[in-house]
Amino acid sequence: MRGLGAYATVFTPRKDFTFAEGHIIFLFNAILATDITEILVQTGWVARGVLAILLLFSLISWAMIFQKWGMFGRIRRQSAQFLHIFRSTHGVTNPQALASSGSPFANVYAAGYRELQAQVGGIAPNPHPPRLKSLSAVTVSMQLASAEEVRRVEKGMAWLATTGSVAPFIGLFGTVWGIIDAFAGLGSAGAASLRAVAPGIAEALITTAAGLATAIPAVIFYNQFLQNIRDLGQRLDNFAMEVTAQVEKAFN
C-alpha cells in the first residue's frame, strides 16, 4: 500500500509563516508521508483494541443491514402479492388470500379471520349470515397482530442505533489516547524531534476515521429502516380498518 503522501501535495512553509505554523505544516507532511500499514503495525495495544472493537461493531452492523434489506424486500413482494389476491375478490371470505402466508398483511388478516370464525362458527357464504357478537374483538385481534408484526421487523434496530451513537465515542477514546501518547513522545524526545509526535497523531486520526466509518453507515440505514417500519405499521393499521369495514358490512 502506498503512503498517503503519494496522493497528497506536500505543503512547504512560506517565509512569512510563524514558527508555530511551520511546525504544524511539518507535522502534517510527516503524517501524509506515513504508510497506513506502517501506522497499523506500530499502533499500541490501546489503539489496536479500539480498532478491533470498531471492526466487530462494523461487521455485525453490516450483517444486520444486509439482513434487514433482504427482509424488507421480501415483505414488499409478499405484501403486494397478498393484497392483489385479497382485493381481487369481494367480501371477507377469501381462503386463498389467507393461505398466502409470509406477509405481515396475511398474518393480520389471519388474526381477524380466526376471531371471526370463533364468533360466527364459520364464514362460508350465507344468505342469512349470523350477527357478530363483538366487532371490536375482531378489530382488536388485528391490531394486536399488527403490533406484533411491527415488533418482529424492529428486531436488530437497537444494534444499529447503538453502533451509530457509540462508535464515534469509541474512536474518540482512541483519538484522546493517541494525543496523550503523542505529547508523551514529545516530552521524552524534546521539542527538536517533532517526528516523535507524528505517529501518535496518525494513530489518533486512524481511530477517529474508523469510528466515523463504523457509525455513518449504521446511522444512514437505521433512519431508512425506521422509515420503512413506520410506513409498514401505518399500512397494517389501514388494512385492519379495511377488513373491519368489510366485516361490518357483511355481518351487521
How should each PLM-predicted stretch be described?
Residues G3, Q42-L55, G156-S165, F169:
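Alpha-helical transmembrane segments of integral membrane proteins
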Residues L4, D16-T43, S193:
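Short, strongly hydrophobic alpha-helical membrane anchors
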Residues T43-L98:
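Transmembrane alpha-helix/interfacial motif
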Residues G44, W62, P95, Y109, ...:
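Residue-level signature of catalytic and energy-coupling elements of molecular machines
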Residues A63-G73, I216-N228:
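Alpha-helical transmembrane segments of multi-pass membrane proteins
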Residues R76-F173, D181-S193, I220-N252:
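Predominantly long cytosolic amphipathic alpha-helical stalk/bundle segments
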Residues G190-A204:
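Hydrophobic alpha-helical transmembrane segments and adjacent short intramembrane/lumenal linkers
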Residues E203-A218:
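Hydrophobic alpha-helical transmembrane segments of polytopic membrane proteins
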